[in-house]
């Protein structure tokens, strides 16, 4: 269902910002069910069935044209933090802990975390989090750049909505262009990235938002 919902959100121009949060207050997402993992391993189908599906969904979250905010309102482990990495911003409750515990069952973050985490916090911090598999505090997560903001647990969702409302007031075409541009130029040589950005802004200048803004 989430897979289909993401397709709908992508096509809906009336949706200007997306906030992801957990149901209830105990967890944003505690990751995969270890018993379920054991069954997949026994069948030899873990990669083809579970991780491919999960990676596809996470890629869709990352590729959403709208700005995205993860409101980490409870414990966030494994696949949960991998999902949060796909968002543009992460707001975390001060009592929440996050971690990548996969090493404890002879695995590693297989739903994109191995790729996305080093790009966000650097190789050394990523290795530390994945090697030791320890849960870290919200303050530590913010210190290393894993999350963008820490606030009291009971304010996480309201703060995320506040940020979303601020973004929703801005020109949506410009926000989409900035998001797409940053993602696309990340791996380009500087000069190629500059040329790309010139083309992007030329297209942006032809939009209704730009005509009204200028």
Task: Enumerate the predicted regions with their spans.
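A general structural signal for well-ordered alpha-helical segments in protein cores
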Residues: 34, 54, 114, 123-126, ...
